[in-house]
Every structure is written in C-alpha cells, then in structure tokens.
Amino acid sequence: MGIRGLMSFVEDYSNEFFVDLKLRNTKLIIDGYSLFHRLCFNSDLELRYGGDYDLFADVVQKFFESLFVCHICPYVVLDGGCDISDKKLTTLKDRAKEKIQAARSLSLGGGGNVCPLLIREVFIQVLIRLEVCFVQSFSEADRDIMTLANHWNCPVLSSDSDFCIFDLRSGFCSLNSFQWRNLNTIKDTQDYYIPARSFSLNAFCHYFNNMNKALLPLFAVLCGNDHVNLPIMDTFISKVRLPLSSKGRRYHRVLGLLNWLSHFDDPTEALDNVLKSLPKKSRENVKELLCCSMEEYQQSPVKLQDFFQYGSYVCTDASDLGLPEWVLGALAKGQLPPFISDALVLRRTFLHTQVENMQRPNAHRISQPIRQIIYGLLLNGPSHAEDIAQNTLPSQLLAFNEVERIDTNIKTSTVYAKQLLKDQCDLSKLAELPLARRQMLLLEALKVKQVVLESIPTFLKLPIAVTCYWLQSTEAKAKLHHLQALLLGMLREPLHAIVNSPGTEDPQRGGAKMLYEELCQVKAPMRPGPRVDLDTAHVFCQWQSCLQMGLYLNQLLSTPLPEPNLTWLYNGSLVHRLCQQLPASSSVESLLSLCPEAKQLYEHLFNATKSYAPAELFLPKTKSKSKKKRQKKKVASLGTTADAKHWYDRSNRFGPLMPESLEEHVENSELE
C-alpha cells in the first residue's frame, strides 16, 4: 500500500518529520481500510480459525469510544471497487499471492497476517451500531480523503504512505503512533486527548534542500507506488547514479530519488531529465503513464462533504458508466460491497484466500453457483433486456473472471453467469420488486424452501438458509460435529440477550448465564496452541464463503431477509474448539436443559438444517451390532482422550448434541 519503503523511512526518522499532537475537539477523516487492518492485526486476535469477530468488534468499539471521549468526530472513508483503468491489477495480484503464503503459514502453525473473510462487513456493522459517519468511495479512497480533509481543515488518520505525498493542511496522523489506548488529560483539567504524531510535509521538504512540494507526486511514481511498476524505471535509476546516503543502503532508492529531485525547480524540468535517460522509443509512453499516475495526487472532484451533510454522492466516473442510481447510492452507503461494483464494471472479482487446506480446491468453489446468480442479476440490465427475454445472450457476455487460489498460486478462471428467467426484472428496477419475489429469488439461489425457515427467528433465517445450502453441496465434507458446533455458536447472541435483559433474577437467566459462560470458556485462547486441523478449517472456510455470497446476494436484492449480526454469529476459536471436544463426549441434553429457551432454539435450528444434510452425516463412524457395544466403545474412547476429561470434570454436561431421538429420526428417514 502506497510508496515502497517510504513509510518505514519517515517513521525511522520520525523526529525529523513528525510533530507531537494532543488530538481532541476536532473532526478526523479516517482511512477505513487502514484502520480495520490495523485493529485486526495489532490487537492480539486469533487469525487461524476464520475470525473471532466478537473480539474484533470489541476492539473497534473501544477505538471509537476513545475518540468520543476526546470529542473527536470521526468520518470513515472506505475504499470501493478496483479502478476502472485497472492500473493496480498487478499490485492486487501480488498482494493476493502474499496473502496465500501468509494463509499457508498460519495453517501450518506459523505466523502471518490474513484478515478473516467477513472482517470488513463486521467493521461496517459496528460503525452503523455506533452511529459513526462513513462512506464507501466508488474506487480507491485516498484522493477523496485528502479533498475532504482539506475542505474541513482537519487531520487524516491512516497508515498509507500516499498521505506523505498529499499536501494536507492539517497534517496526516500515522496509525503507528496514534495512542488511542493511552488517553491523557490536559493539565489541571478533565479534558482528554489522544497522544499522536502528525507528519509535517514542510519539515520533510525542508530536510531535502527545501524541495518544491509539487515534485513529490513525481517522486512517488518514480519510487514505485501501487499504480506504477515499470521495469524500465530501473533503467533510469541505474543511469542517474543516485547518490548513496550516509544513512546506509536500506533507503538508497528513497533517499537517492529525493536528493536527486530536490535539485529541480518543478516537475516539468525533473520529468524531462527522467525521459532523457530512457530510450527514445519509450519516452512518449512512459511520459503519458507517469503524468497520468501523478494526477492521482491531485484533488478529487468528489465532494464527500455533500454526502455527509446532505446524503448526496456524485461521482462522475460512476455516473459515466450508466449504472442505476439505486446501485450507486447503495454502494456509497456501504449497503453493497465492492465485490458488486467490480463485477459490474470490470467483469472480474477477487476471491480472498482464507486459512484453509491448500491441498484442496479453494473454499470459494462451493459458493460459485450463488455468484453465478449474482452475475446473472447484474447482467440483467436494459442493454441486454431483449436478449435476456429470449435467453439468447452470447457466451462472451455471460463470462466473468474470478481471481482465485489454485494450490499456492493465483489463477484467473472464467465463470459464466446464470441466465435468469425472462420474467426477471432488469437491474434498474430490481429494488422495486415485491418483497415476496425478492425473498423467493434469494431462497431459490440457496436451494431452500421457505417453509423450513418458519420456525427460525428472523435474525437467523439467512444464516440457517446458508447452512442448508452448505450442507447440500458435494464440495463440503461436513461432519455432524461441524454442524453442531456452528449451531451452538449461533446460540450465543440470544443467550447474551437473556443474560443482559433488564428485570429481576430468575432461574431461566441463571441457566442462560451458566450456558453462556460455558461457551465463553470453551473459546478461551489456545495459544500457543496446536496446529490447525486443516479439514475442519476448510469446512468452516467453505461455510463462511457461502455466508459471504449469501450476504452479498441478499444485499443486491435489498435485504429480503434481515442481515444477521455477524459479531455474534461466528467465532472461529469457539467452533474449532467445539469440534475438538464434541466427538469425545456423550450428551448435550443436560447442558441445554440449563436454559430451556436455548434448547428449544437449538432444536429448531437443527431440525431446519437436518432435512438438507446428507444421510451419512448422521451415521455412526463404525457400525456395531448392539447399542450396548456402541456405548462401551464410546466409553473406551473417552478414556484415551485427554480433552474428554475436561468435559467429564464438568458433570458430563457437554457432548455431541446427538440424543437418541436424533438416531431415531435417521432411522425413520432411511425407512422412508
């Protein structure tokens, strides 16, 4: 992200380029992408098991509470889809490769930073709950952030080195030195502030021979940023013989370029000297590319202040594409993800790698049919209305590219959109379809009958529908304990609500509290823990992929089913730990009987999903001639399993959640 080596350089010499700041009583423009990555990777969160989203949400909430205490008014700006010019494609693919290696390292017990799949959606849900103002730019947000900060004359918070290039009136605060966990008070007052450090562009230019600020965009593209990666620039670097700094070789390129550029009065003179060192046949193309890339550091025409004040988002790049107004509005409000705009504009999407089994096909394969329906809805526009009505769209118009993991590398695969029935409404009117019609489209995509969800609470209808889809897929290798662990995890939100509901103490609340605390203890940190069970990890990565695409389709259809609270829905540490314990224990009925409401809800969830599960999910691992032999075998296995002792020390309250009645259901279904 940003200019190679620049952020490390300015922070290594922070005493030269940064000034101390006591941040309070101000607006603050926050680079949302930088923030949620920083909070995810620097808060000691478990990253191996697909996301402890509740703990991440707690960190996000505490961050913004620190701002509120200091009377700092945050405005979060999120990146949107890829730029229509696709000039960052090489950079994006390089990052995707790096994430694959990091995910592989985590899966084998090593280190690495990989954001859990739904971290961005969780971040947005927390912003909404805390009523933090936010906007999603149509593409990369840096210029929009700079323009808004200068309009409001307030600082920017980010970790992107591009903000060292922008001429920001009130400076740029680096997340690395933003001490939001260490609030201080103004002397002799009770007024809080956040100790921070602000990058001084004036000090930076003064350090390099009082160089002209206007030269910095040229420095950025010569040094190598996300937009420019020309091998021919290495020819220029070698020919100009950049001076070797006394600071050493680590920052040779950064220091050499800055010192070299500082001898020129303006960008035109410097650019001419750059081009002179290149072969004549390359000069015009290189000049055009460099000038175009330097434009990325100029003011944005988008006025985010109008969005925050009046709800109006106008982006000429987006408008010129002829996208429906409701789609543009939903993208700006974060009600549609960048995945949708990438598919709409570029006909290409990135499928982000998770900590999964790298020896198996990537976990997103399971949700491809859902994506094909999403692509079909996006194709369903006025320009193709007649062809769609006759089901005569040529195959090239149905083609979308997906950048996905293949083994430990990336590959672009072609996927064809699902041609929808001729009575489907076009994209511009999709949001106007009756609720029942939109709900039917969603459930048909997930291959679930509406009647199955009738007994399910509204906040769990979408996750249960997704779980039914997941169980039906031949890609999934789910076992009974995987399903049980997921459903148990879904009990945490209603349990938490019971425990924290106002009113006098009652036996029900006491039981709910005991069950909730039991689940909390199960998900206690396991570090330094065992290596990831790759088969279990892969199964849950597949489920999360189904959930992600189910969420996106639900959003595209204007949420015919309520969006679930992702904070409480899935906790990777909990479900992985449950999967370790469940096969080694014997019965859950006594545990769930502590809270009759939780037991009843669990039964509803299980009954809804079991009708879509393959019959082998419920078969015992080894056939036995009698129930007595089965019980003996179970006891014997418990005696040799260290983890089982944990459950039995708790009066045998936890187990595989498969009471005898479920075996009877299986037998009945086989008879039918």
Curated annotation (Swiss-Prot):
Residues 349-398 are annotated as: Interaction with SHLD2. Its EC number is 3.1.-.-. The keyword Hydrolase applies. GO terms for biological process: double-strand break repair via homologous recombination; double-strand break repair via nonhomologous end joining. Disulfide bonds: none annotated. It is an enzyme of class 3 (hydrolase). Keywords: Hydrolase. One of its GO terms (molecular function) is 3' overhang single-stranded DNA endodeoxyribonuclease activity. Disruption phenotype: Aste1 deficiency leads to increased genomic instability, impaired DNA repair and defective immunoglobulin class switch recombination. Structure-specific DNA endonuclease that specifically cleaves single-stranded DNA and 3' overhang DNA. Contributes to the control of DNA double-strand break repair choice by antagonizing BRCA1-dependent homologous recombination (HR) and promoting non-homologous end-joining (NHEJ). Recruited to the single-stranded DNA ends by SHLD2 and cleaves the 3' exposed DNA ends, therefore inhibiting DNA end resection (necessary for HR) and promoting DNA end protection (necessary for NHEJ). Interacts with SHLD1, SHLD2, SHLD3, RIF1 and MAD2L2/REV7. Belongs to the asteroid family. This is Single-strand DNA endonuclease ASTE1. It comes from Mus musculus (Mouse). The gene is Aste1.
